[in-house]
Amino acid sequence: MSDVNAHLLAQRIDTVLDILVAGDYHSAIHNLEILKAELLALAADDAEQQNQPKAPWEI
């Protein structure tokens, strides 16, 4: 299972909010898209690890 650092995630969301307050909507959306892609990649890695066949001694 991936280890999502809640503090780091909150900092990144805060950065996006600061960008929105500054009025740079394009950059804020771009940053959110990057964050979303990273989180989806983490989720895909988790799903891939969970779907690996177990060794006979793990069943």
From Swiss-Prot:
The signal peptide here is none
Give a single Pfam family match: YciZ
**Family annotation (HAMAP family):** UPF0509 (MF_01641)
Could you say which protein family the record assigns here? Belongs to the UPF0509 family.
Protein name per the record: UPF0509 protein KPN78578_12530
Where does this protein come from, organism-wise?
Klebsiella pneumoniae subsp. pneumoniae (strain ATCC 700721 / MGH 78578)
